[in-house]
Amino acid sequence: HETEQIYKDKIIAFSDKEVVKKLKITLKIKKISSKKKIYLENKKIFEKLKKDKKFRKFKGLSIDTRTLKKKNVFITIKGKNNDGVKFIPEALKKGASFIITSKNIKKFENKIIKVKNENNFLNNFASLKRDNSNAKIFAITGSAGKTSLKNLIHELLKNFGETYCSPKSYNNHFGVPLSLSSLNKNHKYGVFEVGMSKKGEINNLTKLVRPHIGIITNIGEAHIENFKNLRGIADAKGEIINNIISGGTLILNRDDNYFNYLKKKAIKRNIKVVSYGKDKRSYVHPIQISKGKDKTKLKVKVGNQIIILSIKNINIYN
């Protein structure tokens, strides 16, 4: 934008615009996808949550004031019947640290963190929490037995270190990211339940969880109305294999009709397969089962070892 330069007693006509043209500078501007922008935006919020003293007592996310705990951060998710914005006063009254919302709200301004989209924030925040965890992660799916197995694994792992377990049956597109939001650096293990009612859901959820160890309990007819056949359900449950960390493990029920089908999928991804079941070829299988009134005594072969267990009368597969 200069038109001249003064040199000693001379005025020299000059155009920096023309100079720049001669340089033939090419600007390569890399466009950031909208998803990446949202992720970066949420990352900034996450960094704020970590650094700000006010957030150090942050204890997970909540989308339901009925189950909200003190120091939770409340997200105003809009559902079919209700909009979370209506419940902001109740959330704060119950002790919510902050409110995450996309709405312009002047009231409670010091407690509001504005985001572009609440659902995206929930998923991206869960992903960031997973990024910052060094825990060994388990993800359990299957047509039946998920919740009871999750609770049993939790009880066992507690003996070896601090363990986080997803509450109740938090296994859907809200429950899984909410569970991940409570994972912290003190946790040595994390146990998560992953459910589905249609194709693609387990893939999306396990992208967030990224388990070291995946478990498929069985393939049954639950949600068969959304699939052509049982093979479709096996494919949907098998989506967990896509997101098991490289070099990880898949635990499969050898007695299930889709054992070999799922095993092949896992081997293609270089995932180690550990089998269990009543079939004697299983890596883990019972040699002797003695059922009593209240307890069951089991003699179990695990590889080359024999283990004797006395358990309550629960599902032997668990």
Place the predicted regions along the sequence by residue.
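Short, charged/polar "capping" segments at the starts of alpha-helices
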Residues: N104-E109, D256-Y261, Y283
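Phosphate-binding loop of NTP-binding sites
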Residues: F46, N119-R254, N260-I271
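Short, ordered loop/turn segments at secondary-structure junctions
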Residues: E2-T3, K103-I105, K168, I219-E221, ...
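Structural signal for conserved beta-strand scaffold positions within catalytic alpha/beta enzyme cores
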Residues: T76, T101, K114-V115, A139, ...
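N-terminal leader/targeting and accessory segments in enzymes
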Residues: H1-N124, I287, I311-Y317
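Anionic group-transfer/hydrolysis microenvironments
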Residues: R66, K78, N104, T141, ...
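Adenine nucleotide phosphate-binding catalytic loops in nucleotide-utilizing enzymes
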Residues: Y7-F14, T26-S34, F55, K78, ...
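Cytosolic catalytic headpiece of P-type ATPases
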Residues: N104-F108, S148-L149, I219-A222, K297-L298, ...
